[in-house]
Amino acid sequence: MRVIVKIGTSSLTSDSGEVNMSALSKLVSEVVAARTQEHEIVVVTSGAITAGVQKLGIPRPDEPEILQALSAVGQIDLMRAYGEEFGSHGVATGQVLLAPHDFRDRNQYLHAETTFKHLLRLDVVPI
């Protein structure tokens, strides 16, 4: 069975906006346990903007363009944290970034679907 796990910002970050490694470790352990029950797991995560805001030490802005830039900054640390936690269980991860056009355009959609299938066949957790 394929299972999609959505991990929200409040589940990943402390009140100060830092990635809460203890919480992340627990979530990853639960995902790893589900994988041992023959489930294919895909993780959908939030938290990149909050991680970017914390890293740069600035107040959270409202402008979409700046939020996107902060997401780019925070995404690196977030994926590093996921990679380290899953790696401690011997599980590889792969980053998949999707945009709205990946769902609207049939070719883009099929390309994304193929990528997910290959990652799962390689026993990689797509994030």
Residue ranges with predicted function:
Residues 1-127:
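Nucleotide/pyrophosphate-binding catalytic subdomain
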